[in-house]
């Protein structure tokens, strides 16, 4: 069985506004069904692609403010989100909604960094970096949701016993 654990930070505070934000997710962990020998054999020498998983992050703040989400992992390898020692997770954010309006995403490197990239409906999540929410310019909101898609793959190898591969996604809310 392959198991992906999602660890989520639940509170963030803005020092300037003394406003509290709460982070929730539709799922705290994602399990993949056991990968059968036939599936691994069919993949040959190529990595085994696991079914894409999807979950939603929700942020609720006491007052409207700029919200940025930053992503880390306790299981990182070569600057990527690792899945065990022979796999990786590719994470994409999309379908962002802030206070009942669709918004675009922009990758950001740090909490106070200016926005320099183009906005898009989808954004690839980079380890130890984040996303900001824009509609022309960075928006202020008290309610926010964003869908994360997790596409995982693992190196094909002979497995004789039950093996659990662990991945981890840590999400931090920052209100710059």
What are these regions (language model features)?
Residues 17-176:
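Mature extracellular/passenger domains of Gram-negative fimbrial/pilin and adhesin proteins
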């Amino acid at each position: 069985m392959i198991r992906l654990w999602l660890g989520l930070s639940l509170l963030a505070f803005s020092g300037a506004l003394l406003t509290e934000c709460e982070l929730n997710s539709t799922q705290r962990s994602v399990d993949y069904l056991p990968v059968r020998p036939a599936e691994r054999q069919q993949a040959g020498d190529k990595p085994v692609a696991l079914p894409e998983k999807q979950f939603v992050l929700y942020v609720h703040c006491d007052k409207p403010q700029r919200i940025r989400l930053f992503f880390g992992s306790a299981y990182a390898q070569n600057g990527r989100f690792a899945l065990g020692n022979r796999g990786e997770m590719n994470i994409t954010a999309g379908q962002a909604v802030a206070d009942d309006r669709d918004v675009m995403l922009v990758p950001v490197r740090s909490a106070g960094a200016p926005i320099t990239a183009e906005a898009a409906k989808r954004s690839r999540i980079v380890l130890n970096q984040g996303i900001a929410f824009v509609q022309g310019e960075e928006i202020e909101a008290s309610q926010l949701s964003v869908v994360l898609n997790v596409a995982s793959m693992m190196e094909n190898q002979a497995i004789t016993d039950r093996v659990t591969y662990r991945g981890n996604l840590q999400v931090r809310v920052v209100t710059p």
